[in-house]
Amino acid sequence: MSDDANSSLPDPLSWRPLKAPSLAEFEVIATEAFRRLPAEFRRKCEGVVIHVEDTATDEVLDSMGIQSELDLMGLFQGVGLPFQSESAPVQMPNMVWLYRVPILLYWAEHEETLGAIITHVLVHEIGHHFGLSDDDMYEIERLAE
């Protein structure tokens, strides 16, 4: 083959500079995934803070009885809508923790996009604590832009 024929092929080494997203890049992806969720769902989540860490702390894992830090992709901490009250004392904001390393490992083993996995974890962590059914959560994921 001539060099001209080979020039139309993609560079087989073009993947070499690719890396897994850093914590900062992962947070950008998570923020964008949240922004693409249906407006009605985002309104229910007003004030929810999204945190990204590599893995859950030992304290979190111990409190949940989880043996491996790789088994937890996300966690909601706070008070879900069914339990909120106007007369309740001031509380910390609701938070969703996304754990980068377990999510990246899941991504490597499955044929889903990273954005779809992050969206799924976000919706399910928030959704369970807001009393949504699995069907409701799948519909929210489907409607994500």
Question: At which residue positions do the language-model features occur?
Answer:
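Active-site rim/adjacent substrate-binding subdomains
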Residues: 2-117, 129, 133-136, 144
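Catalytic glutamate of the conserved HExxH
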Residues: 121, 125-129
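Auxiliary alpha/beta "docking" domains used to position bulky ligands
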Residues: 141
